[in-house]
Each structure stands twice: as structure tokens, then as C-alpha cells.
Amino acid sequence: MSSDNQWSADEDEGQLSRLIRKSRDSPFVPIGIAGFVTVVSCGLYKLKYRRDQKMSIHLIHMRVAAQGFVVGAVTLGVLYSMYKDYIRPRFFSESKK
């Protein structure tokens, strides 16, 4: 086998190096997770100042906002990977001819 192969056994790789490798492969997943944590943190902080709003309504709004951020990040990741795999090679291969 060649030495430049990307595969490595799970025992050889630590959690931090695995997280870094996966973040390089799909960078929008950590962005989605960070956005989710941010929205939930802000929602829990604002829970104290919700005035006369019901708790269930506040939690539903927080959940919808967090899901929206994650779905948006996943959608941007899919669009970026489609661009990288299909659109960019088509333009750069035509410019060389």
C-alpha cells in the first residue's frame, strides 16, 4: 500500500485529530453545530426575560431557530460540495483547452 493513503485505524487516531480531519472534509458541519449551540445559549439566556410569553412557546421558537440554522448550514455544505465536484472542474477544464 502507498504511504500517502488517507485511511488510518481508529486506534491510531485521537479524538482531536479525528475532529480536525472531519472538519476539513466537511467544514459546514462544525459551523452548524456552533450555530446550534449559539442559538440554544441565547435562547436559554433570554428565558429569564421572556415576560408574559409561555415557556412552551419560547422553547418552540428556540428549537425552530436552532433547526433552521443547522438546516441552512447543511444546505450550504451540500451546495459547496456540488460546486466543488461538478461546476468548478467544468470551468477550469474548459479554460485549459
UniProtKB/Swiss-Prot annotation:
**Which ranges sit in the Extracellular compartment?**
48-58
Q: How does it sit in the membrane?
A: Multi-pass membrane protein
List locations, semicolon-separated. Membrane
Which Pfam family, just one, is annotated for this protein? HIG_1_N
Give the Cytoplasmic membrane side ranges: 1-26, 80-97
Kindly state a single biological-process term from the GO annotations of this entry.
Answer: mitochondrial respirasome assembly
Q: Name the coiled-coil region(s).
A: none
* Record bears the keyword Nucleus: no
Give the UniProt keywords, A-Z.
Answer: Membrane, Transmembrane, Transmembrane helix
The HIG1 domain is annotated at 1-92
* Cystines in this chain: none
One term under GO cellular component: mitochondrion
- Which residue ranges traverse the bilayer? 27-47, 59-79
Source species, domain of life: Eukaryota
Is the Ubl conjugation keyword given for this protein? no
Q: What is this protein called?
A: HIG1 domain family member 1C
Q: What is the species of this protein?
A: Homo sapiens (Human)
Q: What is the lineage of its organism?
A: Eukaryota, Metazoa, Chordata, Craniata, Vertebrata
What's the encoding gene here?
HIGD1C
